[in-house]
Amino acid sequence: MKQTVLKNNLQNLLESAENILLLQGPVGDFFLRLADWLTANGKTVHKFNFNAGDDYFYPPTQAHTVVFNDNYDAFPEFLQEYITQHHIQAVVCFGDTRPYHVIAKRIANENQASFWAFEEGYFRPYYITLEKDGVNAFSPLPRRADFFLEQFPKLAQQEYKAPTPVHGGFTPMAKNAIRYYIELFRNLRKYPDYIHHRAPNAGHYLKPWSLSILKRLNYYIEDIQIAKRVEAGKYGKFFIVPLQVFNDSQVRIHCDFPSVRSFLLHVLSSFAEHAPADTNIIIKHHPMDRGFIDYWRDIKRFIKEHPELKGRVIYVHDVPLPVFLRHGLGMVTINSTSGLSGLIHNMPVKVLGRAYYDIPGITDQNTLAEFWNHPTPPDKELFHAYRMYHLNVTQINGNFYSQVFFPNKNTSDSSTPTT
């Protein structure tokens, strides 16, 4: 009997719907390129624009593009009627926690339309994510080891193969974001009732991003020196704690800590009380947060209150994460994708929030107090099955802000990409 081969979710979306509605995408023209690909494959693509930033990257002159500039309370009924009138079979968005997208998921489910969410890549770099019914901790995938082991024989690609590199990093995203927010702010009158998931003022971002560049230059030499010390074993046995963006939905929605700061202080308190005296802890600032927030004062204050930690807490900014993953004892995270990077390096990972990869056999399931003393690495066979499932099904080679590889027209072979 021939084994069923699992398809990538982009192919599953293509094969499951004729009339597809796009909501908000990532900043930039990715949704316009997605629409072109869907249209080339015979689909009818509809699009809702919610602000002038959307208009700039997906012009309202495009076929079946609708400007929604009514108030937020009117959106459920508007969407309900549109889905019914145009026989929408799939609703697609970027991020499933934005106000309009939360409503869209409910309305889609009530009308037997599938709901698909794009997200930044689970496995980075060079990947983006597409899941049905939700992403991150809202992913519907089972949190059971047996599921991924059972699915492994159905995967077309069972051995890891490096993805095609694409241009990424901060610059292409920042360029798209600056243009998006400039347009959004310049044309607020067209969308007076629009509710944004972040600060809509372009000036809110320009100053921090400028400060971020200056800080990057300031930390450059120090970061190089820290990386050399790590490689030389100067920090001895250490744990790595990668911080997340202060206003990330992963923090706001998928964990019980009120802030990244509260998470940091909780981890430091546990480390001070339970970690072996011969271990250190390295706190890694998130590069996207460089111009917005700094935790050095909090760390210094904590060390002053816990003098036994003097010389054992290291705060770093732009040292590449793999430097720490190659040498650390383990990682503590809220639910960052950095956890997956740690697991790839066979590093024990302790998750303190809700994460799609927090699965027995993959992440450490003991308490944080126990983790400091007995960190448990992932089961290699299980994690390989987990990783390959995602690379086959939920991950797409590319970067939202530069280039994404779409399957060739009219083919079910999603391993043969075109741009």
From Swiss-Prot:
Membrane topology qualifier: Peripheral membrane protein
Gene Ontology cellular-component annotations: plasma membrane
Top-level taxon of the source organism: Bacteria
GO terms classed as biological process: polysaccharide biosynthetic process; polysaccharide transport
Keyword Cell membrane among UniProt keywords: yes
Compartment(s) where it occurs, according to its Swiss-Prot or TrEMBL record: Cell inner membrane
Keywords, sorted A to Z: Cell inner membrane, Cell membrane, Membrane, Polysaccharide transport, Sugar transport, Transport
Entry function: Involved in the phospholipid modification of the capsular polysaccharide, a strong requirement for its translocation to the cell surface.
The name this protein goes by in its record: Capsule polysaccharide modification protein LipB
